[in-house]
Amino acid sequence: MVTSINEPKAVTRSDKGLRFSLWIVQAILAVWFGLAGVLHAAVPIAKLAPFAPWTADVSPALVRFIGAAELAGAVGVVLPALVRILPVLTPLAAAGLALIMTLAIPFHVSRGEPQVTPMLIVFAALGVFVAWGRSRRVPITSREVESAHRRAGSL
């Protein structure tokens, strides 16, 4: 019998713990980047600059672009997995958020703001964890794939 790569495997206890951990981290990333995205995308630069001085020193378009990317990542890290429609987007969104944080490290260090580096590393690591977990270890099966397995009698 030929098996599909997407065929469900037996769920182990460690997989359940990992799935739970991934959902918690996904929620943390969604809240954090959702808030950051709204601030960077919608709050006037003059009001944002006292709390995020870098926003006054770069193009407003860049601040808005970063905000839009953070918002897209916040939605993408949870919604596709939650509704199981194109869940492959979840690890991609997590990787994108990790990339934003990774690029922010040298930017802030070059501005003499190394104190934010630990936080940036933590959020980059959380993004990498979700990208790894949802793409390699315990990916979420899309509704379409699950329906196909049911029709084929493999579930």
What are these regions (language model features)?
Residues V2-L155:
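Membrane-interface extramembranous regions
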